[in-house]
Design a protein with these regions (language model features):
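Periplasmic polypeptide-binding modules associated with outer-membrane biogenesis and secretion
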Residues: 1-185
Length: 185
């Protein structure tokens, strides 16, 4: 199993008795599996953003010919998901993924299905726990505007601005990821 995570699916293991009565184990990992085919399928509102989807396909981290490793496969899927969920599509999710391994040909066929969900926009700010200060204090630090397209980076910038003030010991800024109201996240 350890060799499989590194892309070796046809190892040969041989045990030999040593002159001193011990056992020597010789492992030939076999050929490293390489990517033979990649299919990336998108559904949801991002389906109309052809340039963005083309850019995500071009940036796919495991192209044909690359060695297959489990860690790289996991990272490539996360990078693909982040390419949607960090900007505009906060509810994006991988709905299916598979790596079909053929040990005989040392090849892998990869498929990822991802649903972007709806495009999100920032809504009005809901505040809890602001007992000691007037709500207008928050406006000084440039919150996202209602209707502005969702961006995780924009959200974190606002949270950081609030955390860097002397007014708050801790701050959590997040959106409602409910797909029922993506226009007012």
């Amino acid at each position: 199993d350890i060799l499989a995570t590194e892309g070796h699916f046809k190892p040969a293991v041989e045990g030999r008795e040593t002159p001193g009565g011990g056992l020597a184990v010789v492992v030939d990992p076999g050929p490293r599996t390489t990517i033979a085919d990649v299919e990336l399928h998108f559904s949801g509102a991002a389906g109309g953003a052809a340039e963005r989807l083309d850019a995500l396909r071009a940036a796919w981290a495991l192209p044909v010919g690359q060695p297959f490793r489990q860690g790289d496969w996991d990272a490539a899927k996360q990078q693909l998901l982040d390419g949607l969920s960090l900007r505009d599509y906060a509810a994006a999710a991988i709905t299916a993924s598979e790596a079909l391994i053929d040990p005989e040909s040392a090849s892998a066929r990869l498929r990822v299905d991802i649903d972007s969900g709806p495009a999100f926009r920032f809504g009005s700010i809901e505040v809890t726990g602001l007992a000691d200060y007037d709500r207008s204090l928050l406006e000084r630090y440039q919150p996202p505007e209602p209707g502005e397209p969702y961006s995780q980076e924009r959200l974190l910038r606002y949270q950081t601005a609030l955390q860097n003030t002397p007014y708050f010991a801790s701050v959590v800024v997040d959106i409602d990821r409910s797909t029922a109201t993506p226009e007012a996240a």
